């Protein structure tokens, strides 16, 4: 789907809720995707190829121009080596790239411990962070954590995460989304931030300097570990990360229940002026909307315009939509990322 067509369709989707100017951010058309997942096609001659599904059928592919340049460079090299001695029962390959790093995961329908030596040699030969998975087993060679550097407002922000974390798959657009949020914040009075679905701190770390304090929640223990590490990487001291669901956070804020995970965090000490949410495709459930709608400013990052539209039907009863932005996360597809800025009605 062309960019202009995608924008027109989504403008129409939100037209009854928002009739002001919409900011639109385009993606590069090639080499933008930092995560690429392929199935494996086993040819009759014994060779393998990367493949993708179309109409439930595996279609072999030779290249993938929308993938990050590091992924494109490694694809043929890796395939040649897999064809030598590591293709048996291989059913998938996953690539994850950052500006400065790359990891590759091989998926097998067999006991991977039997090929440990071959995998080790492949990792050394190609200088790769290599992960192998089969049912209930995982082997890691040369580490699995990736380092990333984002350039936000001419400042470098440092991150570390692994393949199990949710990662924005278009680095260029990710930087633009973070800067869009900062542009909004710079025009407003700011106190403390509450962030839900914070992940490994993608937004949190970059926004730390714009608030007195931040309370950030996430249900994944591994994400919280990386978020704390990313605070250290950037010498940030004003963020409190805690592993709570939105329901648990609501109970804690209402003093209905105490949590050991909040030990050392004084919830009464936060003066929250802004809430940031970046939920999964299902959007916000009613309990989360009830939790956040009492706050003056809401910034909502969405990967699903349909569920965003449904949530805004409710939120717009208490809040005014001040800004709406479209981010072309996946160029030439129907997918669109959205950002919304809402303020409590007088």
UniProtKB/Swiss-Prot annotation:
Annotated Gene Ontology MF terms? Answer: rRNA binding; tRNA (uracil(54)-C5)-methyltransferase activity, S-adenosyl methionine-dependent; tRNA binding
User: Belongs to which family?
Assistant: Belongs to the class I-like SAM-binding methyltransferase superfamily. RNA M5U methyltransferase family. TrmA subfamily.
This protein's gene is called trmA
Q: Per UniProt, which keywords does this protein have?
A: Methyltransferase, S-adenosyl-L-methionine, Transferase, tRNA processing
What this chain does, per the entry, is described as: Dual-specificity methyltransferase that catalyzes the formation of 5-methyluridine at position 54 (m5U54) in all tRNAs, and that of position 341 (m5U341) in tmRNA (transfer-mRNA).
Q: Does the keyword Signal apply?
A: no
What is this protein's record name?
tRNA/tmRNA (uracil-C(5))-methyltransferase
Cellular component, GO annotation: cytosol
Read off the SUPFAM superfamilies from this record.
S-adenosyl-L-methionine-dependent methyltransferases (SSF53335)
* Keyword S-adenosyl-L-methionine in annotation: yes
- Note one Pfam family from the annotation: tRNA_U5-meth_tr
Q: Which reaction does it catalyse?
A: uridine(54) in tRNA + S-adenosyl-L-methionine = 5-methyluridine(54) in tRNA + S-adenosyl-L-homocysteine + H(+); uridine(341) in tmRNA + S-adenosyl-L-methionine = 5-methyluridine(341) in tmRNA + S-adenosyl-L-homocysteine + H(+)
| PROSITE patterns, alphabetized | SAM_MT_RNA_M5U, TRMA_1
What InterPro entries does its record include? MeTrfase_TrmA_AS (IPR030390), SAM-dependent_MTases_sf (IPR029063), TrmA_MeTrfase (IPR011869), U5_MeTrfase_fam (IPR010280)
Gene3D superfamilies the record matches: 2.40.50.1070, Vaccinia Virus protein VP39
What NCBIfam families does the entry give? Answer: trmA_only
Active site positions, chain numbering: 303 (nucleophile), 337 (proton acceptor)
Starting at the broadest rank, the lineage of the source organism is: Bacteria, Pseudomonadati, Campylobacterota, Epsilonproteobacteria, Campylobacterales
Per the UniProt record, which EC number(s) apply here? Answer: 2.1.1.-, 2.1.1.35
Tell me which residues bind S-adenosyl-L-methionine: 168, 197, 202, 218, 278
PANTHER family from the xrefs? TRNA/TMRNA (URACIL-C(5))-METHYLTRANSFERASE (PTHR47790), TRNA_TMRNA (URACIL-C(5))-METHYLTRANSFERASE (PTHR47790:SF2)
Swiss-Prot/TrEMBL GO biological process terms: methylation; tRNA processing
